[in-house]
Amino acid sequence: MQDQYILALDQGTTSSRAMLFDRNGNVVSVAQKEFRQIYPHPGWVEHDPLEIWATQAGVAAEAVTHAGLNGTSIAAIGITNQRETTIVWDRQTGHPIYNAIVWQDRRTADFCDQLKAQGLEDEVRAKTGLPVDSYFSATKIRWILDNVEGAREKAKQGKLAFGTVDSWLVWNFTKHELHITDVTNASRTMLFNIHTLQWDDALLDALDIPRSMLPEVRPSSEVYGPTKTTVFASKIPLAGIAGDQHAALFGQMCTRSGMVKNTYGTGCFLVMNTGTKPIESKNNLVTTIAWQIGDQINYALEGSIFIAGAVVQWLRDGLGIIRSASEVETLARGVEHCDGVYLVPAFAGLGAPHWNARARGTLFGVTRGTTSAHIARAALDSIAYQSMDVLKAMEADSGIHINELRVDGGACANNLLMQFQADILGVDAVRPQVSETTALGAAYLAGLATGYWKDIEELQNQWKLEHRFSPSLPADQAKACLDGWQRAIRAAKAWADAP
């Protein structure tokens, strides 16, 4: 019998990707295609759902043919996706009734303020683990029902379907047969009770969203059904679904309570596995579902930082002090440390654990002796400081002391940043050999469901270290750095609060 592989589909915010993995978790083949970002008004962000499907189906076929294989070589398909992005389509025609409203879209911010004024925030947080925010799917669905002609009537008649991107892909891969999602994607809608594992009727009523629109919620690792499209000649089991950050946590094999990963991308996403019980955050973190395998649910705490790698793009595009992002490490190494210069990159407000929408980027401690190297160093340091703020909040909420931080994402290739991250945390930052942890997590979930891999223990043995960064900064110096950062954060907030 020929060797078989797992196909992971990674549907992201700017591109659709497909990756083939072998039994050792190695990448065999990759295909990627970008798609359009649509900005109808300031603060609005949309995608064309048909383009999402076309690009994802296209790269799926491409990754398989690139490797000289066909559908019979694929043991299972796992899906991971940009979370919260909202699609509503007509069940009969299969056509979207409006563009996908993307997670970044802020058009429903005023409606969220109304919900808070009605006193809904405590109920939403208690049931879903989420704050009331336009980031999540619920108010996006409501906007479509209120603003697309005939949508409300069709929804009442049961003619419309809602789904996050995973649901939309499965619906199309199964020729409109399966309307499902997994618990991780459901947990990001602001409509799913993470304790009962059911759609919450009281929240649906409060938002005036018919339950008939919603997909069936399934575990993250399960054989859902076979593909039925012409993308592949043979039927392949669809067997794993998880939102991107949940998949990355699983791909990093953070399978035990207290294990944490940080994905350093445009922003940072830190997720801590908190085991089988949800922990309510007292420090402005989000309580969410890590994954469900069989009957077992794992919960997580999550904190998101808006500006991480984006601060390096700003050094390049805004200040012009580097020509490419890869130059930042060399420039920053031109100084031993930041010499009292601190950059708080609150270009879009501050995310977790501060959640201050009015804060703006601020640069402190600048003297005549300050150079572009100091600013580059302060920019990199700011990524590590913001991550530390979230990790300290996670420790406070969970009562668990973090032993190490598993790192992934584009900016984790920056050795200077990773070393400083270890220095100020006082724990090791560990970088895996396989950096494609999100796609790998989706592959692992699908492979477990089909018996391609035996159990989680087998997968834990596949996790391989590429580099371990251990703290080397003396404790008194680390404390001085942290004190300066805390002063900078306080000053940035004071600036935001000024009349």
Swiss-Prot record:
Residue numbers binding sn-glycerol 3-phosphate: 13, 83-84, 135, 244
Keyword terms of this UniProt record: ATP-binding, Glycerol metabolism, Kinase, Nucleotide-binding, Transferase
GO cellular component: cytosol
Residues that coordinate or bind ADP: 13, 17, 266, 309, 410, 414
Known regulation of activity: Inhibited by fructose 1,6-bisphosphate (FBP).
Pathway participation: Polyol metabolism; glycerol degradation via glycerol kinase pathway; sn-glycerol 3-phosphate from glycerol: step 1/1
Reaction catalyzed: glycerol + ATP = sn-glycerol 3-phosphate + ADP + H(+)
Transmembrane intervals: none
Purpose: Key enzyme in the regulation of glycerol uptake and metabolism. Catalyzes the phosphorylation of glycerol to yield sn-glycerol 3-phosphate.
Record protein name field: Glycerol kinase
